[in-house]
Swiss-Prot record:
Cellular component, GO, one term: cytoplasm
GO biological process: one example: nucleotide metabolic process
Presence of keyword Isomerase: no
Keyword Cytoplasm assigned: yes
Keywords for this protein: Cytoplasm, Hydrolase, Nucleotide metabolism
CDD domains with a match to the protein in the record: Maf
EC number: 3.6.1.9
Cell compartment(s), UniProt: Cytoplasm
EC top class, as a word: hydrolase
Site annotation Important for substrate specificity: residues: R15, T84, Q166
Protein name: dTTP/UTP pyrophosphatase
Active site per UniProt: D83
Length: 202
């Protein structure tokens, strides 16, 4: 059987789709069904470290996507999953549930350096391969008014750590070390390596 010339993207994130397009990779969405509780997969377990957390969540997402592909009887092709989390020390900053939580997170990040961890996993048949990207982001001090204005924009909602690096918050980011695409949600260097290993020509 010839190798597939496309990948299933098991993500609803427009940013990840955009990044995958930068690689020139053909993809098909493998979105969760309406009855799938994807948010439950992102629950933190006890004193789980940020690295252990992001790897575990990515594996759970890949498990769910693999089962989804089987149920739908899809043609064989690599399945790509990814998860991103923001960590301040050992504290995991997930997606804020509301404006108050977004405000609290941004106060923590203001004037500090934090890590952004993105795990990527690809399944090709029974084989699974993984990679992890860790970057560091430094925020300049933000005033209460600046935080309030940013939260009011709605941009922090649905984003790990309550911000989108490619959005308005960029004016407060003083330094980045690592993978910009990884901070956005899909580290392209690691992703390209995984897809090549799965048989795609990039």
């Amino acid at each position: 059987m010839p190798a597939a010339d496309f990948v299933y993207l098991a993500s609803q994130s427009p940013r990840r789709a955009q990044l995958l397009e930068q690689l020139g990779v053909r993809y098909q969405r493998l979105a969760p069904a309406p009855d799938e509780d994807t948010e439950a997969l992102e629950a933190v377990l006890g004193k789980e470290s940020p690295v252990a957390y992001v790897k575990r969540v990515t594996r759970l997402k890949l498990d769910a996507a693999s089962e989804r592909a089987k149920r739908q009887g899809l043609a064989p092709a690599p399945i790509l999953c990814s998860d991103t989390t923001v960590a301040l020390g050992r504290s995991i900053l997930g997606k804020p549930a509301n404006a108050a939580e977004a405000t609290r997170m941004l106060r923590q990040l203001s004037g500090a350096t934090h890590r952004v961890l993105t795990a990527v996993a690809v399944q090709q048949g029974r084989r699974r391969i993984e990679a992890l990207s860790i970057s560091r982001v430094t925020f300049a001090p933000m005033t209460a008014a600046q935080i309030s204005s940013y939260v009011a924009s709605g941009e922090p909602m649905g984003k790990a750590g309550a911000y989108a690096v490619q959005g308005r918050v960029a004016m407060y980011i003083s330094h980045i070390s690592g993978s910009y695409s990884g901070i956005m949600g899909l580290p392209l260097h690691e992703t390209a390596w995984l897809l090549r290993a799965a048989g795609l020509k990039i």
